[in-house]
């Protein structure tokens, strides 16, 4: 994944696991120039840079996303931290893939970030949007019990914990640098 952060690391590890188990996946997201990851196709889309958060863009759904999804015939559609692109894709998936289960994963407390970036007045609206989008999914995954409690306090339901653990190949006592 070109952008390195907690969300892309988690997505990368998920794709590595799916690949190692022989599962197929397709990734839709920002156009980074990446066309595949471990043999999984990556379909990018245009985005407008967010000035207060370098490296992040507001991306737009494309009709070819739905066509590619229909051709791919997924068993499940996973929305990673759905806010902007997820808000566009969830209704399209409900319409064009009505029998395919939808799951989402919660990674970033974006509503709280609004306050940190000086637009705290957006926090209630962002929680409302987040609650609505996650409610359109059959299951919501989050990384910890404390995150689950926070999401439940905000009205988000059907939450399961998807623990991340530690990559013991990368983080070992032998690889320690003093």
Question: Model-found features: residue ranges?
Answer:
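Helix N-cap/beta->alpha junction signal
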Residues: 81, 108, 144-145
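Carbohydrate-associated surface elements
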Residues: 31, 146, 165
């Amino acid at each position: 994944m070109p952008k390195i952060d907690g969300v892309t690391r988690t997505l990368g590890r998920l794709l590595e696991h799916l690949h190692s188990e022989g599962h197929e996946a397709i990734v839709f997201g920002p156009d980074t120039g990446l066309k595949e990851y471990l043999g999984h196709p990556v379909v990018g889309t245009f985005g407008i840079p967010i000035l207060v958060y370098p490296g992040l863009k507001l991306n737009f759904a494309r009709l070819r996303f739905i066509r590619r999804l229909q051709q791919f015939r997924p068993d499940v559609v996973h929305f990673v931290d759905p806010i902007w692109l997820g808000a566009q894709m969830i209704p399209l998936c409900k319409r064009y893939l009505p029998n395919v289960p939808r799951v989402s994963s919660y990674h970033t407390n974006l509503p709280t970030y609004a306050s940190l970036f000086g637009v705290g007045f957006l926090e209630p609206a962002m929680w409302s949007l987040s609650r609505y989008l996650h409610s359109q999914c059959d299951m919501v995954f989050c990384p910890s019990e404390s995150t689950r409690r926070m999401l439940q306090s905000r009205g988000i339901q059907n939450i399961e914990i998807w623990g991340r653990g530690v990559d013991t190949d990368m983080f070992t006592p032998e690889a320690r640098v003093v």
